Amino acid sequence: MAKKSTRTTPEDSQASTTDSAATSTASEATQAATSATDDQAEQTTAVDPTQQITDLKAQLDAKDDQLLRAQAEIVNMQNRNKKEQAALLKYDGQALAKDVLPVLDNLERALATPADDEAAQQLKKGVEMVYGHLQDALKKHGVTEVAAAGEKFDPNIHQAVQTVPVDDDHPADTVVQVLQRGYLLKDRTLRPAMVVVAQ
């Protein structure tokens, strides 16, 4: 068997030098990166562990405070919602009751009209029955008449439309006459009573 001759040409020599330079540059870059990582590690370990614990506790306390505030806000919203729902249920039907009040007024006017003959008296009895049933239905749902005649004037439930001088029968700030009845829905004024007040 013949031996192969190993001769180096100038091109081979130049390629070898280029490979060597590239390896050297890569090695230097790796050393620089390692050195930078070591510096960062030294800086990280240079931070005081006690300070880290203090910082973390402060962050934890801040998060706990945020959580407590959020929970308190949720509880407040739930309570507010319950109160609003209770008020809605309590005053349910307020609009309907207000709309029915003029009907009551008209029935009262019809009852105040004198009935001369028997047909009118029969009609009046029918109106009385309707009026009574309507009042019972309203009372059943918490609608009551405002106390007025002879009572002390209360601007929350009375509306003064006229004043008269004070006399022995009517002391100052008392209701002398009711011109239109007022009504309450539970503890809320549906319509104030229109009254004449002694002053």
UniProtKB/Swiss-Prot annotation:
Single annotated GO MF: unfolded protein binding
- What name does UniProt use for this protein? Protein GrpE
What is annotated about its quaternary structure and interactions?
A: Homodimer.
Sequence ranges of Low complexity compositional bias:
11-46
Q: Which InterPro entries does the UniProt entry name for this protein?
A: GrpE (IPR000740), GrpE_coiled_coil (IPR013805), GrpE_head (IPR009012)
User: What role does it play?
Assistant: Participates actively in the response to hyperosmotic and heat shock by preventing the aggregation of stress-denatured proteins, in association with DnaK and GrpE. It is the nucleotide exchange factor for DnaK and may function as a thermosensor. Unfolded proteins bind initially to DnaJ; upon interaction with the DnaJ-bound protein, DnaK hydrolyzes its bound ATP, resulting in the formation of a stable complex. GrpE releases ADP from DnaK; ATP binding to DnaK triggers the release of the substrate protein, thus completing the reaction cycle.
CDD domains for the chain: GrpE (cd00446)
**A cellular component term (GO) from this record?**
cytoplasm
State the compartments where it is located. Cytoplasm
Q: Which Gene3D superfamilies match?
A: 3.90.20.20, Head domain of nucleotide exchange factor GrpE
List UniProt keywords, sorted A-Z: Chaperone, Cytoplasm, Stress response
Which is an annotated Pfam family here? GrpE
Primary location group: cytoplasm
State the similarity comment: Belongs to the GrpE family.
Species assigned in the record: Lactiplantibacillus plantarum (strain ATCC BAA-793 / NCIMB 8826 / WCFS1)
